[in-house]
Structures are given as C-alpha cells and as structure tokens.
Amino acid sequence: MRRYVAALDQGTTSTRCIVFDHGGRVLGLAQREHEQIFPRPGWVEHDAETIWRNTELVLAEAMRTLELSAADIAAVGITNQRETTLVWERATGKPIHHAIVWQDTRTDRLVGELGGAQGPTRYQDRTGLPLSTYFAGPKLRWILDHVPDARERAEAGELCFGTMDSWLLWNLTGAHITDVTNASRTMLMDLRTQRWDEDICADFGVPPAMLPEIRSSSEVYGEITAGPLAGVAVAGILGDQQAATFGQACLSPGEAKNTYGTGNFMLLNTGTTPVFSKHGLLTTVCYRLDDQPAVYALEGSIAVTGSLVQWLRDNLGLISSADEIEPLARSVDDNGGAYIVPAFSGLFAPRWRPDARGVIAGLTRFVTKAHLARAVLESTAFQTREVVDAMRADAESQQLDLELTTLKVDGGMTANDLLMQFQSDILDVPVVRPVVAETTALGAAYAAGLAVGYWSGTDDIRANWAADTTWRPTMSDQDRATHLAAWNKAVERTYNWTA
C-alpha cells in the first residue's frame, strides 16, 4: 500500500524533502542548505550541481529516517524557487554557468534595452509581467550573451534551459519539462495559450530548441530512475508561491494567501480568466490540474521582508538571532516615529522602482534599537498593505467580485504574533494561520497525489485545511490612516537613488 506522498521543496536557501500522509500532515522531513554566491554587487548565484546532490541526500535521508521505501510512496511532487535560471548541456547534464537567482539584478540595463520605447509594459499584455530583472527570460539572455559559444550551442540543440523544477526533474527522470506556473515566470510564455511565444523568444534571442516542454501542474511526468525512490512517479510541479496557494486551499476566486519568507508573495485566485493588472501587480498562472482549464492569480511580489530581519542581525548586529526581534520590538509601544523601507534592490510590487534604495526615515534621539526592531516588522505589514490596496483597485476598476475578507498566511515570519496582529490591524481584515505550516511543500504533494488518485479531488484539499490561529484588527481608523500616510512619505524618499 502506497501510504504517503513526498514533496521536494527546492528553495532559495535550502532543499527539503517532506513526507505527508493522506490528512496533509507532516510525517517527517530532511533539509540541506546551500551556499549563496555573490560574485559582484547585485549578483546572486547558486551552484546547481550542489543543489542536485543535496536533493539526492534529503530524499535518501527522509526515507531512511522514516524507515520507508519506494513501495510506501504514491508519488513525488516538486516545488521550487521561481525564476532562478539555469542552462545545462543536454549530453552531459552539466551546467554551463551557475544558476542565476531570482534576486539577481545584473540584467538591469538589458531589461531597459528590451523595453525600448514601450518601456516595462512592452510584453505585459501577453505574459502578465512587466520587464524586470526578477524574471527568467532576461537572465537566460544574459547567459547566452556572456558564456562563450552558448548561443550557437543552444541553436544546435545542445543546451537545455530550465528553472529549478526542470533541473530536478531532468536529474530524477531524464525528462525536459516544466509546468505552466514556472513557465509563466519566464516572460517567454503567452498566458492565454500557455505556450512559448515565438515572437518574444525571438526578441529575447532565445532559441526554442533549448526550452522545456510546458505541461500541467498535476500529471505524471516520468518515473524516478535511480536511488531509494526508483520507479516512483514524479507527478506534480508548482512554483513555490503557487504551491503555497494550492496548499492553503485557495481554490476559489477571491481567496488569497500571503507567504512570509525571504520576501513576501501574495496571490489572489482570480479564476479561469487572467486578470491583467493596472495597478502594479503580476498576472500569473496559479495552477492547472491535468487537462482542466488553468486557474490564474494576481500576485504581489515583495523583495525584502524576512531578509530585513537577517540584515538587522548580520549587518547591524542589533540582534544575535532572528527570534530575538519580537521580544525586543514588544519592549516599546510603537515605532517611535521611525519607518524602514527595505528597497535594497529596488521596490517590487506594486511600485516597481528599480531606482529605489533603502531608507530609515523619522529618526530622532528618542529612537532606540527596539523602535527599529518594531519598524522592521512593521515594514513587512505596510508593504503587504500596498499589495492588498492594488488588488482592491484592480478588482474595483475591472468590476470583479474579488473582495478580500480574510488573509491566509504562511511562512516563517507567521510565528511572530506581534507582526501578525499588526498585519491584521493595518489591513483591517482577519489574518489566519493554518495548522499545517508547510503549505508550499504540501501544495506540491497535493498536485502529485491528485495526479495518481491518492486524493480524489480538490474537495479533499479543502477538507484537510484547518485554522490554527486567527488575529483580528483592533487598531482605530485614525491610527491606521496616520501610519499609512507616514509610510507612504518614507517610501517616496527612496526614489531616484540610482537614476
């Protein structure tokens, strides 16, 4: 009896294997971190071969620790850091360059050139995305331009491009495939047809021969060829934020989740018709189950939230561990008038200002490190409020029935009760954390399990979801308005630093 489903969660800082039972509960997990490589300011890379070795190790470790074999696992799902870009040799499977990570900004000038006179929105009506260093297409173009002979080899069919899902699947099964959610983050896929857009690929100088096949998020892509799970089907792939949305059972239009990690990523399910934002949000594929129509989402991507706590710890030394920030912030009643805008690599949604850089505003002699700790946490909530406002503006202007009444949350920072209460206060809606915190891996497990009949349908996913903690707003309208006005003033101080 195949009693469990395994998920591989290939993230920005680590790779994990998590095993789930039919109730969506975590049976056990294994995790390995990998190095963050910073060759130059603004550049971020990963060693993809190390990530693959770590994948093999966590698979084996999880099976060994739980005393399971391939006969116990119904299917494997993959979820991954999105946009991180890799090119490898088809014949040897060897990368020709380190993976270029989603946070990397080396393509800033290239993005401007690609936009031309039309600017960042040149391809948005087809891809749902503004031209940005964030997405995979410009990163791929950079590799083709800068690695000797890469373009010629790609045109000859000797090279494969993929995001990290494709890299893991290639090594597990030999198949060169991506799913529609990851493809939707490349800037090379037409959102409506869910196929590679030949004209955009030509504009980017990307040979179609190197692109993976686009498939649904829930189907059998192939069987694992070696290791402790040899013969088990890989049957689900979702980009990490889409996986968290699926794992949070945001399966109906108007349901939204916000993941608090290195950055914040809020997705709002908009149903089977793509909604193109006029207010700085991304339009993306939320998921597609086998041959069913794709479900779309509006997304607000925030670059720096949890990593701001790391900055406070590692760069300023104001705390020695991340979990010290909550008691420090609680030791004062408010932020003392200080606001921190962490535009370390520009501002993502909804402002999209690559010229912005971080500021601390409102400093006086009264401000202590406790006030700064509180300002760090509050900046996450303020940035989330901006995304929610953009979603509301899109819904109103396009007459969509997508009112956000509750926000489901997940990710490491949701353990911070002070932040979650402030988030509820500044949004003026309840904030709900689920019982199962591993929503990203759970979403990938659900996609894989549905494909092989382990779960019978999405009703099973809804039934598995349960609330753990709910925070309700207590802030007055006047206090909320005062905070938001001060925050906006601080954000506007970040503009034009690199112009």
Curated annotation (Swiss-Prot):
UniProt cross-references to Gene3D superfamilies, sorted A to Z: 3.30.420.40
Activity regulation info: Inhibited by fructose 1,6-bisphosphate (FBP).
Domain of life (superkingdom): Bacteria
Alphabetically ordered keywords of this record: ATP-binding, Glycerol metabolism, Kinase, Nucleotide-binding, Transferase
UniProt source species: Nocardia farcinica (strain IFM 10152)
Name assigned to this protein: Glycerol kinase
Binding locations of ATP: T12, T13, S14, T262, G306, Q310, G412
Residues at which glycerol binds: R82, E83, Y134, D240, Q241
Protein purpose: Key enzyme in the regulation of glycerol uptake and metabolism. Catalyzes the phosphorylation of glycerol to yield sn-glycerol 3-phosphate.
The gene coding this protein: glpK
UniProt xrefs under InterPro entries: ATPase_NBD, Carb_kinase_FGGY, Carb_kinase_FGGY_CS, FGGY_C, FGGY_N, Glycerol_kin
